[in-house]
A protein has these predicted regions:
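A charge-rich, low-complexity, intrinsically flexible signal that marks solvent-exposed coils, linkers
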Residues: 1-115
Length: 115
C-alpha cells in the first residue's frame, strides 16, 4: 500500500499533533487556533468544522479563505529547511503553520509570533 503524503492525510489526524506540541510546552489549544486563524483566515468554528469533516490537510491549507499576506514575514528553519526558501506553495503553507506553532511552543509572545 503506498504511503500517504502529509497533504493527503486527514486534517483531523494532523492538526491535533500541532495542538499537542504546543500544549506539552504550556501553550493552549486556543493559541494554536489563534495562529491558525491569523495565517489562514479560518475562524475557530471553521477549524472545528474541518476537524469534524474528512478534509485533507492539503485541502485545508490550499482552500484557506484569507491567507495572510504577512505570511512572507515567517522565516527560519523547520525540520532543517528554511521556510522562506520553499518553492512549492502548499509545502510552504504547511511549514509556515508548523513554524508558528514551533514559536509558540518555544515560549515566544503571541505578538511576536503573529508578526
Amino acid at each position: 500500500m503506498p504511503r500517504k503524503t502529509v497533504f493527503e492525510m486527514s486534517f483531523a489526524d494532523v492538526y491535533p499533533a500541532l495542538i499537542r506540541k504546543a500544549e506539552r510546552k504550556g501553550r493552549s489549544r486556543a493559541e494554536v487556533y489563534e495562529v491558525t486563524s491569523w495565517l489562514t483566515g479560518y475562524t475557530a468554528e471553521q477549524i472545528d468544522a474541518a476537524l469534524a469533516s474528512d478534509i485533507s490537510y492539503g485541502a485545508f491549507l490550499s482552500e484557506s479563505p484569507a491567507y495572510n499576506p504577512r505570511s512572507d514575514l515567517i522565516t527560519g528553519k523547520v525540520c532543517g529547511i528554511q521556510v522562506e526558501t520553499i518553492e512549492d506553495p502548499l509545502m510552504k503553507r504547511l511549514r509556515q503553520l508548523d513554524k508558528l506553532v514551533d514559536e509558540l511552543a518555544k515560549g515566544k509572545a503571541m505578538v511576536t509570533v503573529l508578526r
